[in-house]
Regions:
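Flavin (FAD/FMN) cofactor-binding and adjacent substrate-gating region
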Residues: 2-8, 91-94, 98, 106, ...
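C-terminal catalytic lobe of FAD-dependent flavoproteins
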Residues: 171, 268, 306, 310-434
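Extreme N-terminal leader/targeting segments of oxidoreductases
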Residues: 1-28, 46-50
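Acidic, proline/glycine-enriched N-terminal capping motif
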Residues: 4, 9-10, 399-539, 544
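Active-site substrate-recognition segment that forms the wall
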Residues: 43-46, 70-72, 94, 101-109, ...
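Conserved, structured C-terminal
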Residues: 425-453, 461-463, 473, 480, ...
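Dinucleotide-binding Rossmann-like beta1-alpha1 core, especially the glycine-rich loop
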Residues: 70-148, 268-273, 277, 299, ...
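Glycine-rich FAD pyrophosphate-binding loop
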Residues: 45-65
Length: 822
């Protein structure tokens, strides 16, 4: 019997009560009975939470799990994703014995092919991450590829990457096994029990409505796959995912032994092949997918679309050319079924910003089987502990902008997202569709100035100004933007540059309770004189870093809070929750306020040319702000700088920003003024060791291990959020952050590279870039607390080679901070 794509699976096989009405209350309700929901249920039970009910609208696995190909991999492109995937690979090997269900786990390995040198570079980086995480992986040559895959025509192949421990599992039976194991531990499973609504009281979830009655619960998990977006939207929660057609086809009998063949990924031709009995399964990740709105998906379980051979014709031809046996065997089954994809092709999980107690685990981008055990384990721990127990920044549901859940936006992005799984994963890659949706007030000026525009969370921003075009600039070794970014970097270090920082998340906290709100929300002491600012962290209740930024007291009862662009959605809701019970209002100023960063040793001179105010150090000291006249209007100038140079952040009404920029441009012409993009800013901030939210710090990091203890005021009259959790930690930090610079200026760092001492891994980079003033690639690295950063045996691994590096506890550029203080 062909057990793949089995539509007969049901919880009734182990839970006779699966057809009963749900219980009136539970500790946790999980919406969705696919492999993600089943994994969360099982891992919650393992954590001791068994008062759980899984509500499935049809039967188990009938959403998208049933038609998955079941690929299992131990390594992904980052340490976080590898941690999730590696646990899954280990778990599937034990699931059959654990559950009593034959889940069909087979581990013949996997083989990824490179048909061009750039792809070989990408595979080499992936091998490095795998090595660091303890996943066996080997770059292989053509002779080794022939031995691993005798049916493969090696023409056009330049290299391969072999993971001996990878394989595949039967996805439907794996989900059934997880659900059965969860049920054995006390979890309830209900089929034909569609969740139709979510109850909210005072910003917190209190239960759900189903087609068979209501369930009261303080925690609800939305694990409904492609239907999750619409269900979340019922209560105003943004979950940006969208469906697309996803195809795999099964060949006829091959006529040769195929059972021991590794999973084959011919990523340059957008397909994978894995054995299935005496046949081969061919799956497609075509460059241009076919998005499908939920309304197009057939009602009921096990939905499919009409087979569409013409759409995958190029992929079929490429596969038959590479594996000629497919031509003789032909194909006898075509499955075209829905799968969901996200704007950045990374899964979504975590607690929502808008509703406390409402969690999401969805948008797996056709990798749900790979991630299900890891997602289940980590979300269960998150629910039990109240905060993530791993570096969740890249997968957190709160990382998106709300507009990215717009269906038109998602429809266009999903055309691209499906193919991105097998496309080149260039450093700094920018999505191509849809673009120009969310713009700063200066967007058109940037375009006219020849900016290469990128995006962050859907916000357009300049990466650099002038040639080359973005599409021609991608490279792992020396990107095309290297020289132009270097010139912009030098402009800030030696003269003066302007950076559009309008994307900063900006909030006003005002009212009689504003000070109390921020003293609780911020780690620093914000009881400041008027027009003074402080750098601070915003922690969760367990001491993890939700965001960092500045707080400026602009009046006795009014504060300006500025945090990174990516934190806007998270910070709005965090501040609102922290202000509950206080006489304070939180207002999002982001869209209505532009910010121009004027940075460099000649920034004071430039500002004095466009403003009659006194810009001396005495009149405008470091971390001070004030209202100023500038150009033909007024602005608020804050003397802070993320570049390590003297500088000012100029905050003005959005409709004045062009006037301010034009005045600066005219006045600074003879000073060599340049517009500066975000890639130069990244290089500048790394030379100073400034942390970047989402890469260097996040909810799993505490201030001490992140090297940011200076931003914590331990002796405030009222403890700040997370303070008690930090103080109760029995042990000091096990890791710390160091600065790393390569000796060889020709080798490029991007982040995720392994740091070693005498060849033994001791940590990895969280950020990397070229430091133009330092003269080589630099980065921030998390290493063991006992690692001596000045050890002369320090090295960083790049594409399998350990390159000599120097380390430091302090930044390589102006470690005393004299230049930024002016």
């Amino acid at each position: 019997m062909d057990r793949l794509a089995d539509r007969s699976l049901t919880a009734a096989s182990f839970a006779p009560e699966a057809s009963d009405d749900p219980p009136a209350q539970a500790e946790v309700v999980i919406v969705g009975g696919g492999i993600i929901g089943a994994s969360i249920a099982y891992h919650l039970a393992r954590e001791g939470v068994t008062d759980v009910v899984v509500c499935e609208r049809d039967t188990l696995t009938s959403g998208t799990t049933w038609h998955a190909a079941g690929l299992v991999a131990g390594a992904r492109g980052t340490h976080t994703l590898t941690e999730l995937a590696a646990y899954g690979r280990e778990f599937y090997a034990t699931l059959g014995a654990l559950s009593g269900v034959d889940v069909g786990f087979t581990a013949p390995g996997s083989l990824s092919l490179a048909r061009r040198p750039e792809r070989a570079d990408e595979l080499a980086y992936a091998r490095d991450v795998a090595d660091h995480c303890g996943i066996e992986a080997h770059m292989v040559d053509l002779a080794q590829i022939r031995r691993l895959w005798p049916l493969l025509d090696p023409a056009g192949i330049v290299a391969g990457l072999h993971f001996p421990g990878d394989g595949y599992v039967n996805p439907g039976y794996a989900a059934l096994g997880l659900a059965k194991a969860a049920h054995a531990l006390g979890v309830s499973v209900r089929e034909h029990c569609a969740v139709t609504g979510i109850d909210i009281e005072e910003g917190r979830v209190v239960g759900v409505h189903t087609s068979r009655g209501s369930v009261a619960a303080p925690t609800v998990v939305l694990a409904g796959g492609l239907w999750t977006r619409d269900l979340a939207a019922l209560v105003g929660v943004s979950v940006p995912l969208y469906a697309a057609e996803h195809v795999h086809v099964k060949s006829g009998p091959i006529g040769a032994e195929v059972g021991g063949l590794p999973v084959l990924r011919d990523v340059d031709n957008s397909y994978y092949i894995r054995p299935e009995g005496d046949a081969l399964l061919l799956g497609a990740f075509e460059p241009r997918g076919i998005p499908r709105p939920v309304a197009d998906i057939p009602v009921g379980g096990h939905a499919t679309f009409t087979p569409d051979w013409p759409h995958i014709e190029d992929i079929r031809v490429a596969a038959e050319r590479a594996v000629p046996a497919l031509v003789t065997a032909g194909f006898d089954r075509f499955i075209n079924a829905p799968e969901s994809f996200t704007p950045d092709t990374t899964l979504i999980m975590g607690e929502t910003a808008e509703v406390a107690g409402l969690f999401v685990a969805a948008g797996m981008n056709s990798q749900g089987i790979i991630y299900a055990p890891g997602v289940g384990r980590e979300l269960a721990r998150w629910i039990v502990s109240g905060s993530p127990c791993f570096d969740s920044s890249a997968v957190d549901v709160q990382r998106f902008s709300p507009h990215q859940a717009n269906r038109r936006y998602l429809h266009e992005r999903t055309r691209e997202s499906l193919g991105r799984l097998y496309a080149m994963h260039w450093p700094g890659y920018q999505s191509e569709t849809p673009r120009g949706v969310r713009r700063t007030p200066l967007y058109q000026r940037h375009v006219e100035a020849g900016a290469a525009m990128g995006e962050l969370n859907g916000l357009e921003r300049p990466l650099w100004f002038g040639p080359p075009a973005l599409v021609d600039a991608y490279d792992f070794r020396r990107p095309g933007w290297h020289d132009v970014v270097g010139r912009e970097h030098a402009t800030v270090r030696e003269g003066v540059g302007v950076i559009d920082l309008s994307g900063f998340a900006k909030f006003e906290v005002a009212g009689a309770g504003a000070l109390e709100t921020l003293q609780f929300a911020a780690s620093a002491d914000v009881d400041l004189p008027v027009d003074r600012a402080v750098y601070t962290l915003f922690l969760n209740d367990h001491g993890g870093i939700e965001a960092d930024g500045t707080v400026t007291r602009v009046a006795a009862d009014r504060f300006l809070v500025v945090t990174p662009s990516s934190s806007r959605h998270r910070m709005l809701w965090l501040l609102r929750r922290r202000s509950q019970g206080q006489a304070a209002t939180v207002t999002d100023l982001t869209s209505g306020t532009a910010v121009l960063g004027v940075f460099g040793p000649r920034s004071r001179e430039l500002m004095s040319r466009v403003s009659p105010d006194d810009w001396s150090a005495e009149a405008h000291p470091y971390f001070a702000g004030r209202r100023v006249e500038i150009a033909d209007g007024f602005a608020y100038a804050l003397r802070v700088s993320f570049t390590g140079e003297l500088g000012f952040e100029v905050y003005c009404d959005a409709d004045l920003s062009i006037n301010v920029l034009d005045a600066l441009s005219e006045a600074g012409a003879d000073l060599g003024l340049r517009m500066v993009g975000y890639l130069a800013l990244d290089s500048l901030r790394l030379e100073k060791g400034y942390r970047h939210l989402g890469h260097d710090i996040g909810p799993y990091d505490d201030p001490v291990s992140a090297g940011l203890s200076f931003a914590v005021a331990w002796n405030k009259e009222v403890p700040f959020a997370g303070q008690r959790a930090l103080e109760q930690r029995a042990q000091g930090p096990s890791t710390r952050v160091i600065h790393v610079a390569l000796e060889d200026p020709e080798v490029r760092l991007w982040g995720e590279e392994t740091v070693s001492v005498d060849g033994e891994p001791v940590g990895h980079l969280t950020s990397g870039a070229f430091g133009y003033t330092v003269g080589s690639s630099i980065g921030l690295a998390v290493v063991g607390v006992d690692v001596d950063p000045h050890d002369t045996r320090l090295s960083v691994r790049v594409r399998g080679v350990d390159h000599a590096a120097r380390g430091s506890r302090s930044p390589f550029y102006d470690s005393a901070g004299a230049r930024v203080r002016g």
